[in-house]
Amino acid sequence: MSEKILLIDGHSILNRAFYGLPDLTNAEGRHTGAVYGFLNIMFRIMEEEKPEYLTVAFDLSAPTFRHKRYEAYKGTRKPMPEELREQVPLIKEMLAAMGINIMSLEGYEADDLLGTVARRSEAKGMDVTILSGDRDLLQLATDKVLIRLPKTVRGKTTIENYHTAEVLEKYQVTPPQIIELKALMGDSSDNIPGIPGVGEKTATKMIVQFGSIENAHEHLEEVKPNKAKESLREHYDMAQLSKELATINTDSPLEFSYEKAKVENPYTPEAYELCKRLEFKNMLNRFDPVTAADSSMELEFFTCNDLSGVEALFEKAARKEQVGISVLADPDQVYTVGLVLDEKEIYQIPVGGLLTGDYLCGKLKALADSTVLCAMDIKAVLKHVPLEEPEKVFDTGVAAYLLNPLKSSYTYDDIAREYLDGMMLPAKEDLLGKTSLKKAWEEEMECLGNYACYQAFVPCMARGVLLEKLDETGMRKVYDEIELPLVFTLDSMEKWGISVKGEELKSYGEKLKVRIQELEKTIWQEAGEEFNINSPKQLGVILFEKLGLPGGKKTKTGYSTAADILDKLAADHAIVKDILEYRQLTKLKSTYADGLGNVIGKDGRIHSTFNQTITATGRISSTDPNLQNIPVRMELGRLIRKVFVPEEGFVFLDADYSQIELRVLAHMSGDEKLIQAYREAEDIHRLTASQVFHVPLDEVTPLQRRNAKAVNFGIVYGISSFGLSQDLSITRKEAAAYIEKYFETYPKIKGFLDGLVKEGREHGYVTTMFGRRRPVPELKSSNFMQRSFGERVAMNSPIQGTAADIIKIAMNHVYERMKKEGLHSRLVLQVHDELLIETKKEEIEIVSRILEEEMKGAADLAVELEVDMHQGDSWYEAK
């Protein structure tokens, strides 16, 4: 069986991947989508072809012999987008890490090198496969040379295969005659001129009849139609030049080594680490565990499992300035503790015998009296170690989040690589795979111990550099005064949870069920038949074919029935309005009526997880379950709040900032008119309507106020005229006029927002009033949509982020005040700009005062922060 060589057209495949796949970036803001797509295509072809040899050809920026022959060659080609350009060295770095041969030659194109190696390999009796997105390479196809052309659409790649027979079947000419076609019809992508008036159809007929441009020219009188004949007569020299430009040089002076092109295992430790850095998580499973382990730095770990040894270790740790800790545990069971004194003293302490979880956690609590405890996730430690002073701990994950809030996770191996001089450590998945902590404790203690050590080692080693970076970026104060205290506030909220009436929840579910069934019958009646309302395909047919509703957009899978499509039809078509309500209620039922019942704890309370390292703007998010997405617009949606109740002897106090983002905008922009309006306690939406629509304040209609409200809040989110037109169901021209009038009304706001975009472009980030940074890599994009998104982010992040900082400060101060004053009341929930306090009835007055003082005093703005406060025996009543 013949040996096989796989030749890849580097720039062509990278280009295909770039335009065929969604834009991807890693946490550093680096564009990676083209590299990811390239590797996926390459791996697929390698698995199918199983070549003994592999090489990738790249063009160089220097002119080639074709440019010297014809100065305008490729002259019309647009510059490579910056997002793609920056990935060229990246793919070369990846290929080098995989040990894959790369070839380039000044004065020649990649096509010439591919053609040269293809012919040399064919002469050696090898089978040759060329992978390219460029059909020019079809001229190289033979029975031994296979041309494979990938096509990527919506992330899905299909591949066309061509030997001689397939070229002949599709194009009616032989592979070498592809050159003749180009000579006549030209190639706009390469600016090969061809001859005027001859397209693909005429060129194909001429070459099928005459075989070559030379033969056609010799039999000029036989050429038809007359237009083509005269064009060939007049422009034959141009046809000859075009043929020369289109011909791939298969004899370029390339020094090529088959030894260097020999395929070894591409899944090297270096490639593994690069995949991790680029966050190609789906590719990591291609690497075997040995490779992953080989890529990692070796550290020496010690096991301490006797009582006297542990006592001595903690005494030694107490004399250190800082130590790294980890607590590997499930909610009701500690399995092992990691303790790191420095880079040489790294210990794991497994639970067992006298070394109980309670004993070890008690030792960690006592240790905080003498030294700073550094951990990856302090909130997770607090579940087992009741620490109380933020200044006694360091949260590595929170610090890393502040420095780069665009990452999706902050693991010890990522932080080691980024902040400890590129140190490579095995990830949790490398050590434990999908094994649970309990099972690892029972069966794989060494792996669990190693994981505990790494979890403690990185925080200990990284604290200094992270604090230095926080100082350099001006975010040390945000870390010390907002984020670190917030860890303790959120931990308290998670531990308390919020009480839920199980019977009320069931009753709510039944109400939803009845209404859903009513809607189902109504929709079927309106449609004239029964169908699956949850099937977009069936729904699309009913709405846009049977009922003939306008606006149907048909895709490969049927009509789109997305919410934005249906929203436009709801006002005029009852069935659409009912379908939208049906969808909302079925989601309510599955997510809340049914879903919440599954997460009620033994204490009758739901203990959600509050995340402070998820959103790029600094807002807190909630998961398991998400209590921040409870609907507020529909009455049936609001009713879900009735199931959340305080325990006996308590009531709910709900405190909500009024228009906090608009007040922040007034302060940060310094717009006197907006500031004055707030100081005079005007209805800001009515005032805006009066100014924008030029009507007296007392003549503003409800519709005008509603539209002004949409503009007010839309400006905060950097809304475009298109977005506003969609929100208000008006034309883009009208929306643009509204926005223009708004900026005329509040002139300093426009300058402020433009300044934010400028700041983002200059620095790569924007900042909140408190100094929190939000990177905006999209501002550098050559893609208009991406760049426009970046501009909106630059405009709204400082406002949203400042509002988020204010609510966090308020939460911390409220939590600390209630604790300091020894109250039984507790903060149980935060939703956007709203705080919910489970308040002991005897403490209502003092808690109300604390909320008022701390929420209003959280920031010193040019306009006063306003707080709306209500109380009730359920969240529904309090809201």
Regions picked out by a protein language model, each given a short descriptive name:
Residues 2, 25-26, 75-251:
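Extended two-metal-dependent nuclease catalytic cores across DNA- and RNA-processing enzymes
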Residues 5-6, 10, 16-55, 71-72, ...:
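Conserved RNase H-like, two-metal-ion catalytic cores of nucleic-acid enzymes
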Residues 514-521, 525-577, 744-792, 796, ...:
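C-terminal polymerase-core module
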Residues 7-8, 130-132, 324-326, 393-394, ...:
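Short hydrophobic beta-strand that contains or immediately precedes a catalytic carboxylate
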Residues 339-343, 403, 409-430, 451-453, ...:
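Function-dense linear segments that define catalytic or interfacial modules
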Residues 235-354, 435-632, 645, 651, ...:
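Conserved "right-hand" nucleotidyltransferase catalytic core of DNA-directed polymerases
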Residues 154-182, 189, 301, 333-471, ...:
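Active-site-proximal helix-loop-helix substrate-binding element of RNase H-like nuclease domains
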Residues 441, 495, 607-608, 612-615, ...:
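Conserved catalytic core of nucleic-acid polymerases
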